[in-house]
């Protein structure tokens, strides 16, 4: 019986850590997107814009893949 409670407790911790990771990733994507939009309006350097856009898109893709793999 104790092991069941432990497993349930462990499961809740795992869920909590997953939710925390999701929130961290969402926050990172939001910050990267906002940063990209600010840089986009200021810079004329095409290479820098392309690199930033790739980084933002990669973050978004990683987040989507995480959701697909875990839910």
Swiss-Prot record:
What Pfam families does the record tag this protein with? DUF919 (PF06034)
Q: Which InterPro entries match?
A: AcMNPV_Orf29 (IPR009265)
Q: What name does the UniProt record give this protein?
A: Uncharacterized 8.6 kDa protein in IAP1-SOD intergenic region
